[in-house]
Amino acid sequence: PQHRLVSDLRPGDKGTIVAVKNTSVPFLQYLDKLGLTLGTRLEVLDKILFDNSLEIKVNELSKHLISVEVSRNLYVAE
């Protein structure tokens, strides 16, 4: 399957997290806090045009707003 950056997804798109670009400890801890770990399903609910942040749903449960910096460092497979 083709891997895509979360930042390239549009509202309604779904994917499973398969890789991270930034492997710094603070970034990985932040992802863990949000429940965004490898194998996690996410769906893009909305894209904020002002700053390209994304509203996402994680594992059909919780909703989060993630910055463009976060979405540029996460890869998903459909």
Segments from the language model and where they lie:
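Mid-protein regulatory/catalytic core that forms ligand/cofactor-binding pockets
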Residues: 1-70
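Amphipathic alpha-helical interface segments
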Residues: 68-70, 74-78
